[in-house]
Each structure stands twice: as structure tokens, then as C-alpha cells.
Amino acid sequence: MIASGVWAECIPLSKAHNLKEVPTVASLPTAASAPETMKSALEKIHYLGDVPCSYKSTPLAAHFELHIEQGPHLISAGQRVGVVTAVQAYRWFRLKIIGRDTHTGTTAFEHRADALYAFAQMMVQAREVAAAKGCLASVGIIEVAPGSVNTVPGQVSFSLDIRGPETELVVEVEKELRSKFDKIAAAEGAGIGKPCRVEWTLDFDSPAVKFHEDCIDCVQQSAHAVVADAPVADTKALVRPIMSGAGHDSVFTSKRVPTSMIFVPCKDGLSHHPEEFSSADDCATGASVILQAVVRYDRKRFA
């Protein structure tokens, strides 16, 4: 989504170029190496071009995007095509819990400012609060310091991904979690322990997006045309209107031009996983749908 964000002028080019890789144990920088940036990675593979990336200098009439669903709905229902009508809202945060490093053998529970214990409670609260509002909350990165067997963790940094079908719901989840996290950090209701401090940093904010009706209509008509010869009693049931749970380039392009998306099934609904897979038939179906959708949209434009 970085390139589309730059193209839509929602992400400054300098910010995109300066994005740094998320370090892993295998990629931690040494004294002789700096973390890889987006710009250095593009240079390394000879992809750092000189063509301006902007909707003004390289305009589009519309944008159609083909993607695997990245979820289980199509594959579970035996459906062939998802007509994407919208993308849910999401916000990404980095949080830091600051407690105090102390010895595990000499510090009783009531004297500990245990950042990891506070984090454990926060993670449970995040899931419960999000679920109660029909949203999702996930932690994907956790860093614990100082990282010693016999030291109570004095600091925990973690990511928090909040998603929901409406922007307002995501805001409500965030507001409630801020309040609950403050109480957890203050050791209220825990019965034991000293206070910690929690800090929030917003990394990314993507409001809910509704796609263009003309583009949605073109995708829907094309999907029904492509599956019309399928050997089933009701081919209409093979096509499903769907909201995307994940962010895509279309989120940014939709801010500048009419946009919609096409989903095809993926095995077991898996994505961001080594076993991510879509069959050749499903890929061909998706390619046929996007081709017909583009043709239909052009006819509509010039009618």
C-alpha cells in the first residue's frame, strides 16, 4: 500500500523512502550495518525509478484490483468470486509499558512494577473489548526488556491492530482500551504490584472505505457472466458481496478515482502464511472478471 499511498499523495515520498524494516533476530543490524530502508531496498533491486509517482502526473480513469480474499468466507461457502464493496477501518499503534527492572528472587509481587504482567492483562482486555463491539484487536509484535531469566521485565513494547466495519467503532474500541489500559498500568484491581506507565503512538490510521457504485456494478455483472456456465443449479450463489478485512492499494486509489476490487478464494482462508494458495482455476476466474469489469467500465464511461 505504500506505493499507492504515495501515488494518491496521502504518504509523502520521503516518508515512504525512509520506512525501515521491522528487525528480527536474523536481521538485527550490526555495528557495521544500518536497518534496511524502503529506498535502499529499491536501489538494491534496481527498482528506484525516476517516473513521478502521483495521481496528477500519472493519472488513472479508474482502478480495479484483483486479490485473494485472505479469509475463509468464499472457500467455506464454495463461492467463486467476491465483489468487494468496502474495506473496514483500522488503526495501528505502538505501545510501551514502563515499569521497573528488579530481581525475580528478591522482589515480592507487591513490590513489582511488572510491565509484562500488565501487558498480559492488556492483551486479554483488547480481545474482549473488541469482540463486544464486533471488531478485532490483535498484537503481532512484542519486545520485552531487559530479557533476563531472573529479572522482572521493566519495559514491554508491543503493536496493537484495531479493526472494525465502521470508523466510529474502531474509535470506540480505542477509547475504551485507553481507559482500561491506564487502570491496568496503575495496578487498579490487580490486587498486587506497583504502578507502571503506558504510552501510545499512532502509526497508521485508515478509515473505512466504501467503493464506487459504478465499479462495483461492473465487477458484479462481470462476475455473474464469468460463472454463468458453472455446473451448479444457482450460479448467482457463486458470487458474494463482501467487505475486505484487510487494507489494499484500492484504499488509497479510491480517494482519487472510482475503485473496486475482486476477491477469489484461497486455500483454508490462509494469508501471510507459507501455505497461502489459490488454484489456477480461481486465478483464471479472477483474471476474467477483472478484464470484463474494465471493459464494462470503459463502455459505461463512453456511453
Model-derived features with residue positions:
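Midchain, well-structured core segments that form catalytic/ion-binding scaffolds
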Residues: 2-168
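Short beta-alpha connecting loops at secondary-structure transitions
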Residues: 9, 14, 163-167, 203-204, ...
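Flexible, glycine/charged-enriched surface loops at secondary-structure junctions
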Residues: 49-56, 106, 127-139, 149, ...
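Short amphipathic alpha-helical face segments that pack within enzyme cores
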Residues: 117-121, 285-292
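A short beta-alpha structural unit
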Residues: 140-148, 159-165, 195-216, 245, ...
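Short amphipathic alpha-helices in soluble, non-transmembrane regions
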Residues: 172-182
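Extended C-terminal subregions enriched in glycine
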Residues: 212-226, 230
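Zn-dependent metallopeptidase/amidohydrolase metal-coordination segment
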Residues: 231-288, 297
